[in-house]
Amino acid sequence: METYYKAINWNAIEDVIDKSTWEKLTEQFWLDTRIPLSNDLDDWRKLSNKEKDLVGKVFGGLTLLDTMQSETGVQALRADIRTPHEEAVFNNIQFMESVHAKSYSSIFSTLNTKAEIEEIFEWTNTNPYLQRKAEIINEIYLNGSPLEKKVASVFLETFLFYSGFFTPLYYLGNNKLANVAEIIKLIIRDESVHGTYIGYKFQLGFNELPEEEQEKLKEWMYDLLYTLYENEEGYTESLYDGVGWTEEVKTFLRYNANKALMNLGQDPLFPDSADDVNPIVMNGISTGTSNHDFFSQVGNGYLLGEVEAMQDKDYNYGLD
């Protein structure tokens, strides 16, 4: 009989990177509900109104990008999969992007009033810089070639997020908002894998192109990065001028733009290196998460639930 639909066989791996990425992503699975965000309320109350406004806006911007990535971005990459295991990896990535987007709402519900949350989302959905970068990336997702879509995704994952990530990492380095920053570190850990994996898949396709097409795509890629960086400069100035961090954030952005290019197998564009980035922020960007005492659940790492034996009555839900 002719095969209508094929079952995925994880014992016949075509690309070992698919398997290793799947294992990495599933090993580091997490949910925002396991982070004790309310422990940051004392720190939050001590921040100035200007700082609170900044935190709300950067997380609003990050929510927008993660929403787009979970709804449009990963779906756009599926059309060019090489193996069934790659599709499984994208399923995981798409779900975790939704977890990331939801995590910011958990932060808002802990730190902000209902009115403040509404203001944050109104600002997010109307900010010209945010809407511009969403439009640039999403138009590529909708109309670009398979390789162009991968470039857009890596630029989003490894570059555009970092204007927002700077704030919680800076506070973490100053011993503030440690649990909020723990969520950001978990997100960064995921995005690091996403960017590397999608960049690897890009390189497979790029290396199959004739040299002339490679040069044309490289020119397009660097032009896109310039366009995104120019918009990101304006976004950064609008957010950070009030607290005096603008130039430090721009340095951080340029450093991560180079990392995005490296994920794509390309040469760096900017002269900035890790040595140029604020060391407090670089220390926070480590993709390890904080330690915690499992038995007493002390600390700001990922908390596991207490284990209890099941009893007969536990199976009676909905039957009373």
Put a short name on every predicted segment:
Residues 1-320:
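Non-heme di-metal
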